[in-house]
């Protein structure tokens, strides 16, 4: 049975300015936006083998739904800043956007671990994008981004310039 680990149903402010601690323990809001929590992601993925699936809805055409699946998904401990390991892409979402983030540490506005250097946003992709994630120069997969903030709520190669209406991330057993 799939386990929902992320849901962004509007891309406005649900993930905006969430702290390291909030992403660590998880959160939800009354609109249905949700993050399971990095610590639980770590505990789940180091003890079992999981696949990761994204369900994405394009903002350009709300009836178009896309999937991206990764046969390997692992989140390391907080001592590694919840480093991401992902591989084995398949799906109809076009370009393999998440593999660009493989091997990266999680970044939030108050704990900057991304290798970006752009002083306008304090060299921090979470500030620019509006939400925490595994960033590399802000990257190609911005499912925790906020609409109208920086690079927006985005998956490279989706129709309509990559902008999304909704995203969901699921864990399924391999």
What is the predicted role of each segment?
Residues 19, 127-149:
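Extracellular C-terminal loop/segment signatures of secreted glycoproteins
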Residues 149-174:
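C-terminal helix/juxtamembrane-tail motif
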């Amino acid at each position: 049975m799939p386990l929902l680990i992320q849901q962004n149903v509007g891309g406005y402010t649900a993930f905006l300015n969430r702290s390291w601690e909030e992403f660590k323990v998880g959160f939800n809001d009354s609109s249905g936006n949700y993050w399971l929590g990095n610590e639980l992601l770590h505990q789940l993925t180091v003890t079992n083998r999981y696949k990761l699936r994204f369900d994405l809805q394009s903002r350009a055409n709300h009836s178009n739904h896309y999937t991206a699946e990764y046969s390997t998904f692992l989140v390391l401990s907080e001592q590694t800043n919840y480093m991401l390991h992902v591989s084995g892409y398949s799906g109809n979402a076009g370009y393999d956007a998440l593999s660009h983030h493989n091997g990266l540490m999680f970044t939030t506005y108050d704990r900057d671990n991304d290798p970006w250097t752009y002083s306008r946003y304090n060299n921090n992709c979470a500030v620019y994008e509006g939400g925490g994630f595994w960033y590399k120069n802000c990257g190609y997969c911005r499912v925790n981004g906020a609409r109208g903030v920086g690079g927006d709520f985005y998956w490279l190669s989706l129709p309509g310039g990559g902008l999304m209406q909704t995203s969901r991330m699921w864990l399924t057993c391999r």
